[in-house]
């Protein structure tokens, strides 16, 4: 395995952290078991004790979320072992990679679920991955993150990572929280949540937020604005419960793009977007002029609504039905680099200087400029999912049978390209005196489309579990899925359909697992599975020639896991050895270019450790060590998978203490990541980096809490990705610069 020395050093560090595990336990602790219940990976989400689960799942509750202070939903996923997240593009548009699975961007192997239902069945469409349409706030009680395991069989059959966010729910007691947050970059945010009982056995939770800021990378105007409102109602019945919810969101933020590397003044705080360039005119289709506001960035305006019915039927049968409806707009506007930094004299018509189109300033020939594409993506999406399951326990046998159905649609209008030269500075303006800046075609390629797509999925699945002995449990799962897609594309906005798809495919996924209990608080598990990532709309457009040649565009994923788990009174420790192979991955550098078809393999181990002591000290550690390889490729066989670190580690210690008669908590996070390659050719190296975060919570009175949190305390200039559209990688995207948030909240 590559980098063996680095891996052994990391393993030594992890072992040192874990060495106090045995010392910290006593006989009384062994009798007090943590009854953590997880619902991810179970048929219909009935739930299972975490210590009994034969798969790797991570729980992050509201308290931990508060301490992690994530800037986006994707940012929270950094706390999940086996996951590499590039969340440096802003609130939306993250890149999420799972356990060495391949990917050139977005989050092709991530499903975000709310109350057990996928928020959108297609994990990734161009300019849309699941986390982009989900916002965190005070209404969330817990997130579960399941990697591999039974994933390919249950729910939407995601073979990679399924995250399930659970809403807070009401009880007989009326409870509430009001929270105000500000920051050193001008954030103004107000959160509120209230819950209680409406009538006998009918409970409510309502909450949401409103926020405004000029952005952590200051654009000079209110580049981030949003509001969200959530209602969750639960009716308890004599033999079950009914739950309904809706989450209404209108939230947009600046889209932070890669910027030139090794140019003075361009760093983690830099954004090209500003008041002098947010408004623009582009030409699309038959050279029709269109006024746009690039300050609208990326966002989500829509709703995620659904519910569930859970019933205890006669003869020991259980019934659960979970459903979800998502509708809205997920639009994207941005200044996308169309090349590297250049000197003005090399592109100016007169070879000397040029004039600013807004201010009239004359810029000299040694001024840095850059060609920027003014990209517009308008996307209307809708989906409805339903997951129905029956289950029953027979002595040593547990059986479940389910039906999952999904209807997914997307209507897209794009105008990509529209490039012009801008002064390379924060808010830098477009220039007069460069011929292509005023031409209809612009200074680089253009790609415009109008498309519509509908997909339907119908799957039948079953899971069977047999308790062979008091210690050994065996399980098996099967899923038969039919996937249909109808899709058409007008690629020139001229009313002519250039690409049309009428697609149908059926696949059978499976999982086999064994769980062995070493003691009441300790066990091991083994599992193998095979699943599939079915194609959606953009897969056909990007790979149309490959599809016409008979390739079904289905990614086949085979995984194996071997895990150890321990859950004591104050210590949890999970270690999972994983191996996977992904066949049929396609990578397209830019729309219209040929697809590269790959097979990727990965071997690694992930650690998830939590320690909580009565002294007030707690520690969370998650780490991943992996070796990836492209095993089949026309040109890159034997190389490492792009943008996949060989190792990463994240340690979050916390200490509770009294300060002048007040309860206080000091906490921090240290994270480090290995070098990565920015491309499949392995010619672009993205250097590893370390990052420190620090926070303090003080509770001066009952219900009152003050919190200050510093992110990237040392202002590390780490790079998360290169330039996926340029093989020379003259640009890169920095992690977010140092920022400080302060909040005050009152709970009752």
Q: Model-flagged regions — what are they?
A:
Residues 49, 74-118:
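Extracytoplasmic beta-strand/coil segments of soluble accessory domains associated
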Residues 175-177, 181-267, 297-300, 304-313, ...:
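Transmembrane beta-barrel wall of Gram-negative outer-membrane proteins
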Residues 118-147:
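Short acidic/polar hinge/loop motifs at secondary-structure boundaries
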Residues 35-68, 93-95:
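N-terminal periplasmic "start-of-domain" segments of outer-membrane beta-barrel proteins
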Residues 73-76, 95-97, 112-113, 130-133, ...:
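N-terminal periplasmic accessory domains that precede
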Residues 230, 234-236, 241-308, 331-375, ...:
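Acidic/polar loop-and-plug regions of large Gram-negative outer-membrane beta-barrel proteins
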Residues 671-679, 697-748:
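C-terminal beta-signal and adjacent terminal beta-strands/loops
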Residues 469, 572, 577-582, 588, ...:
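Gram-negative outer-membrane beta-barrel transporters
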């Amino acid at each position: 395995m590559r980098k063996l020395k680095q891996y052994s050093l990391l393993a030594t560090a992890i072992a040192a952290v874990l060495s106090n595990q045995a010392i910290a336990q006593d006989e009384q602790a062994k009798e007090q078991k943590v009854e953590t219940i997880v619902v991810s990976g179970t048929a219909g989400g009935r739930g299972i004790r975490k210590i009994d689960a034969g798969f790797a799942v991570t729980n992050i509750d509201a308290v931990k979320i508060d301490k992690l202070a994530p800037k986006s939903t994707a940012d929270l996923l950094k706390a999940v072992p086996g996951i590499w997240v590039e969340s440096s593009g802003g609130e939306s548009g993250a890149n999420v990679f799972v356990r060495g699975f391949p990917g050139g961007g977005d989050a092709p192997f991530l499903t975000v679920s709310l109350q057990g239902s996928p928020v959108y069945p297609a994990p990734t469409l161009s300019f849309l991955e699941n986390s982009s349409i989900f916002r965190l706030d005070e209404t969330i009680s817990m997130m579960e993150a399941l990697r591999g395991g039974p994933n390919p069989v249950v729910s939407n059959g995601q073979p990679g990572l399924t995250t399930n966010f659970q809403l807070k729910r009401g009880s007989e007691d009326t409870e509430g929280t009001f929270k105000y947050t500000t920051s050193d970059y001008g954030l103004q945010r107000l959160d509120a949540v209230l819950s209680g009982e409406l009538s006998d056995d009918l409970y409510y939770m309502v909450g949401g937020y409103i926020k405004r800021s000029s952005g952590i990378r200051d654009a000079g105007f209110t580049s981030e604005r949003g509001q969200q409102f959530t209602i969750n109602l639960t009716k308890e019945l004599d033999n079950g419960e009914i739950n309904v919810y809706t989450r209404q969101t209108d939230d947009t933020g600046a889209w932070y793009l890669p910027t030139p590397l090794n140019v003075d003044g361009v760093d983690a705080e830099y954004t090209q977007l500003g008041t002098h360039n947010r408004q623009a005119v582009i030409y699309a289709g038959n050279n029709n002029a269109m006024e746009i506001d690039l300050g609208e960035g990326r966002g989500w305006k829509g709703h995620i609504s659904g519910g569930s019915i859970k019933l205890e039927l006669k003869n020991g049968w259980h019934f659960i039905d979970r459903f979800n409806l998502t509708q809205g707009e997920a639009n994207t506007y941005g200044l996308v680099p169309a090349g590297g930094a250049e000197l003005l004299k090399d592109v100016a018509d007169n070879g000397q200087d040029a004039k600013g189109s807004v201010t009239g300033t004359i810029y000299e020939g040694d001024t840095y400029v850059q060609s920027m594409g003014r990209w517009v993506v308008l996307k209307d999406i809708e989906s409805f999912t339903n997951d129905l399951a029956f289950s029953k326990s027979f002595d040593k046998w547990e059986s479940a049978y389910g039906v999952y159905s999904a209807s997914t649609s997307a209507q897209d209008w794009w105008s990509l390209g529209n490039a012009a030269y801008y002064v390379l500075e924060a808010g830098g303006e477009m220039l007069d005196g460069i011929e292509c800046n005023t031409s209809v075609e612009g200074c680089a390629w253009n790609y415009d489309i109008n498309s519509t797509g509908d997909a339907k999925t119908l799957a039948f699945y079953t899971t069977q579990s047999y308790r062979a002995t008091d210690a050994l449990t065996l399980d098996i799962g099967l899923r038969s899925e039919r996937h249909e897609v109808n899709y058409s594309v007008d690629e020139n906005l001229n009313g002519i359909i250039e690409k049309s798809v009428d697609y149908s495919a059926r696949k059978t996924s499976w999982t086999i697992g064994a769980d062995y209990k070493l003691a009441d608080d300790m066990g091991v598990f083994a599992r193998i599975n095979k699943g599939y990532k079915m194609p959606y709309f953009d897969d056909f457009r990007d790979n149309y020639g490959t599809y016409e040649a008979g390739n079904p565009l289905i990614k086949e994923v085979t995984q194996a896991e071997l895990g150890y788990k321990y859950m004591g009174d104050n210590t949890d420790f999970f270690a999972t050895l994983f191996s996977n192979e992904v066949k049929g991955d396609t990578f397209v550098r830019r729309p219209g270019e040929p697809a590269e078809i790959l097979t990727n393999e990965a071997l690694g181990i992930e650690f998830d450790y939590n320690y909580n002591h009565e002294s007030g000290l707690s520690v969370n550690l998650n780490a991943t060590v992996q070796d990836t390889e492209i095993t089949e490729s026309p040109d890159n066989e034997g190389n490492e998978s792009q943008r996949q670190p060989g190792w990463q580690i994240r340690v979050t210690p916390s200490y509770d203490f009294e300060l002048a008669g007040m309860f206080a908590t000091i906490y921090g996070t240290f994270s480090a990541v290995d070098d990565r390659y920015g491309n499949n050719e392995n010619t672009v190296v993205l250097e590893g980096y370390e990052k420190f975060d620090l926070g303090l919570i003080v509770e001066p009175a009952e219900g009152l809490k003050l919190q200050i949190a510093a992110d990237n305390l040392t202002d590390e200039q780490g790079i998360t990705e290169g330039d996926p559209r340029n093989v020379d990688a003259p640009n890169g995207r920095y992690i977010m610069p140092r920022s400080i948030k302060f909040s005050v909240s009152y709970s009752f």
